[in-house]
Regions:
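Bacterial Sec-dependent N-terminal signal peptides
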Residues: 4-5, 12-42
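Post-signal-peptide N-terminal segment of Sec-exported extracytoplasmic proteins
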Residues: 39-73
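Conserved aromatic anchor
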Residues: 51-53, 141-153
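Aromatic sugar-binding surface patches on proteins
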Residues: 78-93, 178-187
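Surface-exposed, short loops/turns at beta-strand junctions within beta-sandwich domains
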Residues: 92-100, 189-200
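Edge beta-strands of extracellular beta-sandwich domains
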Residues: 113-122, 213-226
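Proline-enriched interdomain boundary motifs that mark the N-terminal boundary
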Residues: 125-135
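Beta-strand-rich modules
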Residues: 191-221
């Protein structure tokens, strides 16, 4: 998901000197395309393109055209049209990475203005993390997830789900070790996770690769999941 909340400029143009005129807000949005990789049911790494467009001004619709000219309407939106994105189905993933190059976004704002944006996708992708362990401690009051570090990943984030409900979310974090550790882990008190009661919990670990060290636009993400009974 990436929903890129890039802080774009919002200009307030004051008309007249009396202060009685109405202010106009300049329409501006940020658009991002990035590669998402997962392992399918057969254990094969597959890829798709994720599109995310954000604006402080409500948008009516967003469409994107790939470097090869294929159009796609972004039908998922949140916050009254401040964010548009695509939710890929299993059939949208392929063993071949998405086409690199410039993706063109046509953004239609609620006031009728239409603006075109572009974002370029490189060829880099991330492998899904190899989760080596997900288990409760001997005392039974904590749970640890362990995984092999993903080559080239800038950071990670973790989401814990119980069915369709989010039980816990760990925002992006990075390994600050020098040198970087080959294996990583996160631990949680059980009472941090089990607000939805006992049952099957899904840990969703995502690796993040940004376009640059300004850490705003994404180039690629990868997601691995594993279940545990809590």
């Amino acid at each position: 998901m990436k929903k890129v909340h890039l802080l774009t400029l919002i200009a307030l143009i004051m008309l007249g000197l009396s202060g009685c005129e109405k202010a106009k807000v300049t329409n501006e949005a940020s658009a991002d395309v990035f590669v998402k990789s997962i392992k399918n049911a057969q254990g094969v790494t597959v890829y798709t393109a994720i599109h995310s467009v954000f604006s402080y001004n409500p948008m009516k619709s967003v469409s994107v055209t790939s470097p090869g000219g294929a159009p796609l309407q972004l039908t998922n939106f949140e916050n009254g049209g401040n964010s548009f994105f695509n939710e890929p189905a299993v059939t949208d993933y392929s063993t071949t990475a998405p086409a690199s190059g410039a993706y063109t976004y046509l953004v239609k704002f609620n006031d009728g203005e239409e603006i075109t944006y572009t974002n370029s996708l490189a060829t880099a992708a991330l492998l899904p993390a190899n989760i080596t362990s997900l288990a409760k401690t001997a005392s039974g009051d904590s749970v640890y997830i362990k995984w092999d570090a993903i080559p080239s990943s800038h950071a990670y984030q973790l989401k814990v789900m119980k069915g369709t409900k989010q039980a816990y979310y760990q925002p992006a974090f990075a390994d600050g070790s020098v040198p970087l550790k080959p294996n990583l882990r996160l631990g949680f008190r059980l009472n941090q996770l089990t607000g939805e009661g006992s049952g099957t919990y899904t840990f969703e670990l995502t690796g993040l690769l940004f376009e640059s060290t300004t850490y705003d636009y994404l180039q690629a993400i990868s997601t691995s999941t594993q279940n545990i009974e809590l």
